Curated annotation (Swiss-Prot):
GO terms for biological process: glycolytic process; lactate metabolic process. Its main location: cytoplasm. Induction: By nitrosative stress and anaerobiosis. Expression is not detected during aerobic growth. PROSITE patterns: L_LDH. It catalyses: (S)-lactate + NAD(+) = pyruvate + NADH + H(+). This is L-lactate dehydrogenase 1. Homotetramer. The modification Phosphotyrosine is found at residue 223. It comes from Staphylococcus aureus (strain COL). It is found in: Cytoplasm. The gene is ldh1. Belongs to the LDH/MDH superfamily. LDH family.
Length: 317
């Protein structure tokens, strides 16, 4: 009988994002056991072998195996990276509908295993699919997390760090809202060591143009990467690994994830990217940044965009 007990992750979806996330977990020894599920069982078999061969060089031993939905019964975390990609000529609503059907099946299979852990959702549109996972699973909102704007915030901090020649970790700045075109930067609270970044940028000759350029580069980064190499996966995989680390180490770390709002930011019944405290129980609480009027208006527009799409989705009615 296998009596092994440690932090266990089940990864559902072994595409570019999923496999990159799996490598990040093994590379950093964030988990004790990793189970991978995908329809392409032969690719899973190959990746499991490849990852196992990497474990002698990871900080601690990580057990990696191919699995099935029954393996979710004692998992601490189920991470969903599976889903359909948007095809040429396909509308966003078409993609939403297709992925909602996929998620209904996946979440149903996971819950049938008697799973009682935390869901982490990465598939796009992530805010809508995190909401769907919460609805389909019946789990408390604290135990369903979307990757949200964790990658957008990382891109934002990177560009700001380059503008000021400091380490990205020294920049305190967030992108909130939909993980998509309606996201927004919280300039009113962005700072380095307490110094407001927008004020510092505005003091430069080309500062105002640079402010707009930094946000546009942040928002449109995915399009540039997709044009160059077909997809984005390393950045989001590292973001997922960071969320996983915060959960398993019970960090109470503040990360910009997709969380359910129940009055915070003047919004209700929507999963959307906001700062939240992450620990072993999932989302401890949403952190409410005092937004200025312009930011609040943009955030409301972002939330409405998500709600309008969900209102048209038959699978959520």
């Amino acid at each position: 009988m296998n009596k092994f007990k440690g932090n266990k992750v089940v990864l559902i979806g072994n595409g570019a994002v999923g496999s990159s996330y799996a490598f990040s977990l093994v590379n950093q020894s964030i988990v004790d056991e990793l189970v991978i599920i995908d329809l392409d069982t032969e690719k899973v078999r190959g990746d499991v072998m490849d990852l196992k061969h990497a474990t002698p060089y990871s900080p601690t031993t990580v057990r990696v195996k191919a699995g099935e939905y029954s393996d979710c019964h004692d998992a601490d975390l189920v991470v969903i990276c599976a889903g359909a990609a948007q095809k040429p000529g396909e509308t966003r609503l078409d993609l939403v509908s297709k992925n909602l059907k996929i998620f209904k099946s996946i979440v149903g299979e996971v819950m049938a295993s008697k799973f009682d852990g935390i869901f982490l959702v990465a598939t796009n549109p992530v805010d809508i699919l995190a909401y769907a996972t919460w609805k389909f699973s019946g789990l408390p909102k604290e135990r369903v997390i979307g990757s949200g704007t964790i990658l957008d915030s990382a891109r934002f901090r990177l560009l700001l760090s380059e503008a000021f020649d400091v380490a990205p970790r020294s920049v305190d700045a967030q992108i909130i809202g939909e993980h998509g075109d309606t996201e927004l930067p919280v300039w009113s609270h962005a700072n380095i060591a307490g110094q407001p970044l927008k004020t510092l940028l505005e003091q430069r000759p080309e500062g105002k143009a640079q402010i707009e350029q930094i946000f546009v580069q942040t928002r449109d980064a995915a399009y540039d990467i997709i044009q160059a190499k077909g997809a984005t996966y390393y950045g989001v995989a590292m973001g997922l690994a960071r969320i996983t680390e915060a959960i398993f180490r019970n960090e109470d770390a503040v990360l910009t994830v997709s969380a359910l709002l129940e009055g915070e930011y003047e919004e209700e019944d929507v999963y959307i990217g906001v700062p939240a405290v992450i620990n072993r129980n999932g989302i401890r609480n949403v952190v409410e940044i005092p937004l200025n009027d312009e930011e609040q208006s943009k955030f409301a527009h972002s939330a409405k965009t998500l709600k309008d799409i969900m209102a048209e989705a038959e699978e959520l009615k």
